[in-house]
Amino acid sequence: MIEAVASANPNTVVILLCGCAVECPWADSVKGILYMGLPGQAGGEAVADLLYGRISPSGKLAESWPFTYEDVPSSKVYGKTTDALYQEGVYVGYRYYDKSGTAVRWPFGYGLSYTTFAYSNLTVDGDTVSVAVKNTGAFAGADCRAHFRFHAGVAGRAFFI
């Protein structure tokens, strides 16, 4: 249905209200996608503010979004037994996609804004990371930077922690 609407109106924007990654085979045929997660009672007002440009999106994805359900490692066993099988070990989320080389639609940490930012003066002092962030765009906006430390992981694989 989304593809049919987008074909009739090239300015279609899809608003996703969901608590996890979902398949979005129509993603390339719409003008925009606004992922709201589970926004609660003020969600409608937040959507309106974002769509009308009163505020700029600044969130980042907390998980990788696969292209299809079949790209999820548990898809091969889910529903085939009454037992819960946790065969992935530490290879869940981005770790699985990284290790297996499976392409994802949107990676962990992905997010867009109506504005742009410049970064400078990166410093690292032990566990403290600092960076100067400057809004270089035409819209007011906030930026959410995530910095990760690598752990040696299992069998020499590095993991974000």
Description of each model-found segment:
Residues 1-6:
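Cysteine protease catalytic core and zymogen-processing segment of caspase-like enzymes
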Residues 17-142:
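Secreted, periplasmic, or luminal enzymes acting at the cell surface/secretory milieu
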Residues 140-147, 159:
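Short, hydrophobic/aromatic beta-strand segments
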Residues 7-12, 30-31:
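A short helix->loop->beta-strand "cap" motif at the edges of active sites that frequently abuts
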Residues 9-11, 121, 135, 151:
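Detector for Asparagine
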Residues 72, 149-161:
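Short aromatic-acidic-glycine turn motif
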